[in-house]
Amino acid sequence: MLDGELNRWFLDPLLRGTYPHDVLERHAPNAPPVRDGDMALITAPIDFLGVNYYQRRVVAGTADGGWRTVHQDDSQHTDMGWEVSPDGLRDLLVRLHDDYAPPPIVITENGAAFGDA
């Protein structure tokens, strides 16, 4: 569900022309209305897809249908507690390519917080 709310909620309408059904069902009472003409505007061609990436997030489901972050003890972490996982950006870019075949991708933000910087 977290993937739907943080990723697919934004990418699916832009690159597929529809909102993810699982997220819509979960949030139906609070979902914004989609009016005539909205999807035509949302799916207008874009020159590039900007990606802001700082860390991967490993999660597990909870009994109430929510999620919790699973701390990766065997990984290096920044001073802010973010896991250092260089493969995460690569995995994201591969997923975007495989799932969406987007226009050119521009890494618009990334980085980490360390005490010496």
What are these regions (language model features)?
Residues M1-A117:
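Active-site region of glycoside hydrolase catalytic domains
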